[in-house]
Amino acid sequence: MKRAENLVRLEHVQEISTSNINYLVYLSFHRELKKAIKSFAKGRLLDIGCGNKPYEIWCSEFVAEYVGCDIIQSSANKVDVLSPANSIPLESSSFNTVLSTQVIEHVEDHQGLVNEAYRLLRKDGYFILSGPLYWNLHEEPYDFFRFTKYGFNHVLEKAGFEVCEVNANGGAWATLGQVINHTFDFKNPKASKMVRGLKYIFRKLRLFVVVNKLFSYLDAKDYNTINTMNYVVVARKK
């Protein structure tokens, strides 16, 4: 199977609504990503794994140019540079900002992606990076890695970056709620008739809305990141 045959890219920014089954991660992920873009995005920006550039709208007021790189052309033909993430045919030290959201887990040579971001950035440029600690399998079989905050620190510092921020997206309660939503949403043909019935009721009654409201409330009342779903990380090229 060719890499492109099972590759999915985000078409647009997902709506933050309790009717979205992934509400619990988007609630905090979007908040932290917007903050990082507002604080650190500037000048020429390269989006590695850009797809249809869903976050360009958030960056437009802060950057002078938005360049997108991906391994295949997107459905809306938004990709400017077609190349692997670890070997991008662009001039060194030519960008002020590099952005890569929810891509690093799909790159087998993830250190190569981080090294390329470092090479392409100008001195004192910023790398805004995000990736999961918890998420269900997706884009199989090209779903290679999950990262703790220590894992992100390691790969960034190994490339030469100074890590500025590592922000968790959701605490333990939000993570538990997201696991519940994913488990009930997954249609497993091997499940027993009883379990399939329970999952059908969960979906039919839209109980994920209840889960989203309850577990976001619990997360706010008992916030801890011993378990979290995702991280938004900012690093500076020294």
How should each PLM-predicted stretch be described?
Residues 37-38, 122, 157:
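Residue-level signal for alpha-helix termini/capping positions
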Residues 40, 105, 147:
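Residue-level signal for short amphipathic helical patches enriched in basic/charged
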Residues 100-103:
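A short beta-strand submotif of the Rossmann-like class I SAM-dependent methyltransferase core
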Residues 1-93, 97, 114, 224-231, ...:
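Conserved N-terminal segment of class I S-adenosyl-L-methionine
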Residues 73, 87, 105, 135, ...:
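Active-site micro-motifs of SAM-dependent methyltransferase domains
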Residues 19, 108-112, 116, 126-237:
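S-adenosyl-L-methionine-dependent methyltransferase catalytic module, highlighting the catalytic core
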Residues 41, 108, 122:
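Short conserved AdoMet
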